[in-house]
Structures are given as structure tokens and as C-alpha cells.
Regions:
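Non-catalytic, mobile gating and regulatory segments of ester bond hydrolases
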Residues: 1-15, 28-29, 36-47, 54, ...
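Catalytic PLP-binding core of fold-type I/II PLP enzymes
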Residues: 23-82, 89-92, 123-124
């Protein structure tokens, strides 16, 4: 693409697939992006977006004490959680991240989040009040500037916020650890049944 003189707007890394929880290596992707941008003398840096809509909660294990294992996860679970944490270590390198609370965040649908490292990137999706005056009729609070959609209720977002506050880091660790433990139990039973 670059050799043809075309631009690359964005590179999307997957942080947790729905089937096998595959995690792309963000450190390698960002390193490759930077190397190619320098090599081709690009006057810009392509955006690196982390599609972490499923994998984001596993970031709660970033500072988990795996050697001590205070939540007493079984060995196979602990190994899986440690592997996921290791694979996600470059999440902070992404220029933007997509998060869904209705997947592994235990929130209702219609509660997603788009985070940008550089706040000026939000201007790329903002609306000009002069072009859309019906969104900006009253007061100085102007949510229509930054939202992609403006006619939805806020209940799902408040429910997601309530989950974050109620569960906290430890609550998500317990829930995710239980998911992984149950997957490991099922895997062990299947392995035993297949190879018995």
C-alpha cells in the first residue's frame, strides 16, 4: 500500500476475539507502524486502534499478584489469566480503544465507549453547531458535539458505570476468573472424554 503511495488511515488490533480470545500484539504493531512511517517518510502516523470490546476487562489483572494469587485461582485458570495479561501488556500504546460494556463488562447493550489518547482526535468526529442547530438549542452543555448518535437513552451507560463502581477491579477479577475456571473445567472434561 505504502509503495503505491497510498495512505493508511488506521491499523486495527483485536484485543480478544469472540471465539478463541485471540489477542494481537500491540507492541509489535505499534513498532511496525513507527518503523514503516519512518522508512517511508510519512508526514503522519497511522492511527492504531485497539478493538478491545471483549478483552478490555482483562486489564484488571495488570497489577494482580500472580505469584501470591490472593483470589486463589486454580493453576490452569491462573496460567490462562497470566497469559492474557501478558498478551495485553501493550494496550496503553493504542491511539484509541473501543470498549463494550455489554459483553464481558456485564452491562446492558447500547453501552459502549470510545477512548482517544489524544483529545484532539475527537474533533474528527465532532459536529459543527452551526450546521446542526437542532442539537444545540438550550444551555451551554453540548453533548451533540461529540456523540455519534444523539437520540438514545442514558440508562445503559449509567448501568455500565454502576457496574464499574459496584464491581470494581476485584469484582471483575472474580467474575473473569470464574469464567476462565469454568472454561478450563469444561476443557478438562472434554479432554478426558475424548482421550478416555
Amino acid at each position: 500500500i505504502l509503495e503505491r503511495g497510498e495512505s493508511i488511515a488506521c491499523v486495527i488490533a483485536t484485543i480478544g476475539t469472540t471465539d478463541a480470545f485471540g489477542i494481537d500484539n500491540l507492541e509489535a504493531i505499534v513498532s511496525l507502524r513507527d518503523r514503516l512511517a519512518n522508512e517511508y517518510g510519512l508526514p503522519y502516523r497511522p492511527q492504531v486502534h485497539a478493538d478491545a470490546v471483549i478483552g478490555w476487562p482483562w486489564a484488571v489483572f495488570d497489577d494482580y499478584d500472580f505469584p501470591v494469587n490472593p483470589l486463589d485461582f486454580p493453576p490452569r485458570t491462573l496460567r490462562s489469566l497470566a497469559d492474557a495479561r501478558l498478551a495485553m501488556r501493550g494496550l496503553h500504546l493504542a491511539d484509541s480503544i473501543g470498549i463494550d460494556f455489554h459483553k464481558t463488562g456485564y452491562g446492558p447493550i447500547a453501552s459502549s465507549l470510545f477512548l482517544c489518547k489524544d483529545h484532539t482526535d475527537l474533533k474528527l468526529i465532532s459536529r459543527d453547531p452551526a450546521l446542526m442547530p437542532y442539537l444545540f438549542q438550550f444551555g451551554s452543555h453540548r453533548p451533540g458535539v461529540y456523540t455519534l448518535e444523539t437520540s438514545r437513552a442514558g440508562a445503559a451507560v449509567l448501568a455500565a458505570l454502576a457496574n464499574l463502581k459496584l464491581l470494581g477491579k476485584e469484582g471483575y477479577r472474580v467474575l473473569l476468573g470464574h469464567i476462565v475456571t469454568m472454561a478450563e473445567v469444561l476443557r478438562a472434561k472434554l479432554e478426558k472424554a475424548i482421550y478416555a
